[in-house]
UniProtKB/Swiss-Prot annotation:
UniProt GO BP: translation
Pfam families reported for this sequence: Ribosomal_L29
Name of protein: Large ribosomal subunit protein uL29
Keywords assigned: Ribonucleoprotein, Ribosomal protein
Ribonucleoprotein among keywords: yes
UniProt keyword Ribonucleoprotein present: yes
Record gene name: rpmC
Domain of life: Bacteria
Amino acid sequence: MKASELKDKTVEQLQEELLGLRREQFNLRMQAATGQLNQTHMMKQVRRDIARVKTILNEKAGA
């Protein structure tokens, strides 16, 4: 997910995206804890996507 794609979305869409990413992060953590996670790079990718969404939300709140 690119920041330029996120800037085109509304605040409501960004909040929905953030909620979905947090759920995905939770599921990945549970899979890692039980030893079922094969693609460990996904945890890092989701964490950074969450940071991107939160950054854009803060930018929109300040504007």
